Curated annotation (Swiss-Prot):
Location (main, coarse): cytoplasm
Record Pfam families: DUF489
Compartments (UniProt record): Cytoplasm; Cell inner membrane
Protein name: High frequency lysogenization protein HflD homolog
Keyword Protein biosynthesis: no
Gene3D superfamilies to which the protein is assigned, alphabetical: HflD-like
Record GO cellular component, one term: plasma membrane
Keywords: Cell inner membrane, Cell membrane, Cytoplasm, Membrane
Annotated HAMAP family: HflD_protein
Recorded family membership: Belongs to the HflD family.
Amino acid sequence: MNEQLHNRTMAFAGILQAIAQVQHLARHGESDTDELAASLNTILVTNPESAADVYQDKAALHKGYKLVLNQLGDSSQKDVEITRYLVGILALERKLTRSNSGLAMLAERINQVNRQLHHFAITDEQVIANLASIYSDIISNLGPKIQISGNPLCLQRPIVQHKIRALLLAAMRSAVLWRQLGGKRRHLVFARKAIIDTAKKSLTL
């Protein structure tokens, strides 16, 4: 298997895994604690030696690979809403990587959260609120806001809002890594078969 394509597909799976949780939260108001932790932990790995250092929860990653197959394959399971969120994340990622001040602020704020984890778990409400505020303060102001669809009763709850923003930050982290590994939007069209084949092979690892 092509190592670069494998790592790039891993990062793309990470984006979709976080986005799918956003969708589920917006509709149902609840999240799987292990999946949430897996996505949020990726934010904190800022100097990885490999993509595998970022995505250490294999069960969560496998869900991400299945989402890659659904979104890029010819199946009827392609989700237009997931695609819309993906387009929004990739657009914001481009703006972030062009903003030196934004990247510097992001690094500092993530370091603050890392220090907080000496006392709290990654899924603690205070930690999630801090991750959410990073997204609101730095990412959300870069461009058009991503409009989240869902159950209004769920979306009104502060903890749901915080989890959604924290997961969007996780999606951004994976998008940054995907781009660093050479990912381009045109690959999602012209290299679709190679990405699908890599995701299928990765599911067997």
